[in-house]
């Protein structure tokens, strides 16, 4: 019986060593050599301190900063561990809302967001990505239109000329990946960091 089991054990050990040890180590080593920044999380630093990742959105709420898309991520309720509470951009619990288009809770949330955005900028149509959450709840990007929509609010809050803020948006537009994948986009963290360097007029 041991004779019949031996080939199975040999294959098990060989494949475990190959796929569980050799392959992961080779891929990790290759990533560290070829793409060290990406392999380590595309971390963003300011004055030597890590302040975020270019791949994970943050919950900017101040009028002085550009805001990202709505986020449906949650966290455990400290008062009752069987329930959850909203926790926008919680990277430990990436998720969408799973609310269907006819769900009243979704309609109410979108209406509240629309009303707030229209009060902030009554002149321009509200870009769709400012009222729709991404599937992960962690999208670090918004459309150039969503960034430009927020220019008047940010300029007012910072005492900057709208033209200066608009130029910052235009300078931070990322093109389609490889020139054809996806849409032009703006990384909210990168834009807000550029904004912090701008001087009041």
UniProtKB/Swiss-Prot annotation:
It comes from the Bacteria. InterPro entries: KdpC (IPR003820). It is a single-pass membrane protein. The keyword Transmembrane applies. Its main location: membrane. GO terms for molecular function: ATP binding; P-type potassium transmembrane transporter activity. GO terms for cellular component: plasma membrane. Keywords: ATP-binding, Cell inner membrane, Cell membrane, Ion transport, Membrane, Nucleotide-binding, Potassium, Potassium transport, Transmembrane, Transmembrane helix, Transport. It is found in: Cell inner membrane. The chain crosses the membrane at residues 7-27. Part of the high-affinity ATP-driven potassium transport (or Kdp) system, which catalyzes the hydrolysis of ATP coupled with the electrogenic transport of potassium into the cytoplasm. This subunit acts as a catalytic chaperone that increases the ATP-binding affinity of the ATP-hydrolyzing subunit KdpB by the formation of a transient KdpB/KdpC/ATP ternary complex. NCBIfam families: kdpC (TIGR00681), PRK00315.1 (NF001454), PRK13999.1 (NF010603). Belongs to the KdpC family. The system is composed of three essential subunits: KdpA, KdpB and KdpC. PANTHER family: POTASSIUM-TRANSPORTING ATPASE C CHAIN, POTASSIUM-TRANSPORTING ATPASE KDPC SUBUNIT. This is Potassium-transporting ATPase KdpC subunit.
